């Protein structure tokens, strides 16, 4: 079996990239997955993606690996490019791990994601989107509020100053997002309470791995309990040291409610294979979805990998399971477990290649015009 691991390599493109550490981490994950998947029966290759996605497409069209592990989270240091590689893989008819281009698009644009969640009856904090500082007068929600970039992941753009308690600090936080990230600011009601993560694995059936909770320590005394960029990506910072994740202890009823809410959110945004749903649990027991992370961090020391380990799934088995999910979606059966025949059947089925199908349609149309039909 030939496996291609695609990952973005764009962390050096911008001198002032505010998400540099998150983009750098993807390469480490790619190497870890390559090592976990490599065996005498599997050939695994790393394919970095920088800016020229068309060259990647040509290489994929020529090489046609049996399955692609998609780790691309941006393109040319722009998070909106996250959808480009899966869309390309869909056009080429290549099976790949993780959420589709549609699901990634819906999840990335946080305001659209929240609109869909609300339409499905999934609890999420009240919110609004501001494209200019002048729109501050339209904000009617009660404080405290939290201000985030509207289309970033991995806590990019979040720090203690993101949680605001008055109009003046709200204006500063919104202005900072607009200037730094060149995108609208998402303003939502800040939910005081516990921060809980629900990791999800699989499709039919989908299962919840053991829930985890952030333990906010001394660095958060008299500060908002919020996972900032520093807490997530700067391991020597006090915010990171004092916000470890650990087992989440809930009553059976409350745990079931959190899992049900997470499952509904994942389904609403067309997510698949694996991911994590982040929640705030209010003192009254109401759980609110604050973020959905399809294709979440797969580093061996990530929260997702640790949750899988707690469920009895070691890292190599987790990596192989994600590959199997992609192949099952492509072939609809377990033939791929033989690590060979399924791939031959896929390559022979050229009708799966949408580019080839479109080329055939164009050729037929040209012949029809030549005949004067």
Language-model-detected regions and their locations in the chain:
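ATP-dependent carboxylate activation and anion-phosphoryl transfer catalytic cores
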Residues: 116-121, 249-373
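Hydrophobic beta-strand scaffold residues
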Residues: 44, 95-96, 124, 145, ...
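Active-site nucleotide/adenylate-binding loops and adjacent lid/helix of ATP-dependent enzymes
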Residues: 1-7, 61-64, 104-194, 204-205, ...
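ATP-binding N-terminal substructure of ATP-dependent carboxylate-amine bond-forming enzymes
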Residues: 1-97, 101-102, 106-108, 131-137, ...
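Short, acidic Gly/Pro/Ser/Thr-rich loop/turn segments
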Residues: 10-13, 152-154, 205-208, 216-219, ...
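Phosphate-binding site of ATP-dependent enzymes
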Residues: 167-260, 283-288
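Short acidic, glycine/proline-rich loop/turn micro-motifs
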Residues: 14-19, 156-159, 302-305
């Amino acid at each position: 079996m030939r496996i291609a691991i695609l990952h973005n390599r764009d962390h050096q493109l911008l001198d002032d990239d505010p998400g540099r550490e998150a983009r750098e981490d993807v390469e480490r994950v790619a190497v870890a997955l390559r090592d976990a998947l490599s065996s005498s029966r599997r050939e695994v290759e790393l394919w970095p993606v920088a800016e020229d996605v068309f060259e990647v497409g040509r290489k994929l069209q020529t090489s046609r690996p049996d399955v692609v592990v998609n780790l691309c989270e941006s393109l040319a240091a722009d998070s909106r490019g996250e959808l480009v590689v899966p869309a390309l893989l869909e056009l080429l008819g290549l099976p790949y791990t993780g959420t589709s281009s549609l699901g990634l698009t819906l999840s990335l644009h946080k305001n659209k994601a929240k609109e869909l969640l609300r339409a499905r009856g999934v609890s999420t904090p009240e919110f609004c989107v501001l494209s200019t500082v002048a729109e501050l007068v339209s904000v009617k929600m009660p404080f405290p509020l939290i201000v985030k970039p509207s289309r970033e992941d991995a806590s990019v753009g979040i720090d203690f100053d993101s949680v605001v308690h008055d109009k003046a600090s709200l204006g500063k936080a919104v202005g900072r997002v607009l200037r730094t990230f060149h995108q609208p600011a998402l303003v939502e009601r800040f939910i005081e309470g516990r921060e809980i993560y629900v990791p999800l694995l699989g499709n039919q059936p989908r299962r919840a791995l053991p829930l985890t909770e952030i333990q906010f320590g001394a660095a958060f005394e008299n500060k908002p309990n919020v996972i900032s960029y520093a807490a997530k990506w700067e391991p020597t910072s006090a915010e990171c040291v004092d916000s470890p994740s650990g087992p989440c202890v809930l009553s059976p009823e409350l745990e079931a409610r959190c899992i049900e809410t997470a499952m509904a959110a994942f389904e609403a945004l067309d997510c698949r294979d694996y991911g994590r749903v982040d929640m705030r649990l209010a003192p009254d027991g109401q759980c609110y979805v604050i973020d959905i992370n399809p294709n979440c961090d797969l580093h061996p020391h990530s929260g997702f990998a640790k949750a899988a380990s707690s469920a009895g799934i070691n890292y190599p088995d987790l990596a192989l399971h994600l590959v199997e999910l992609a192949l099952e979606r492509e072939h609809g059966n377990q033939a791929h477990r033989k690590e060979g025949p399924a791939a031959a059947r896929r390559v022979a089925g050229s009708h799966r290649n949408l580019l080839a199908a479109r080329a055939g349609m164009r050729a037929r149309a040209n012949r029809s015009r030549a005949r004067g039909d």
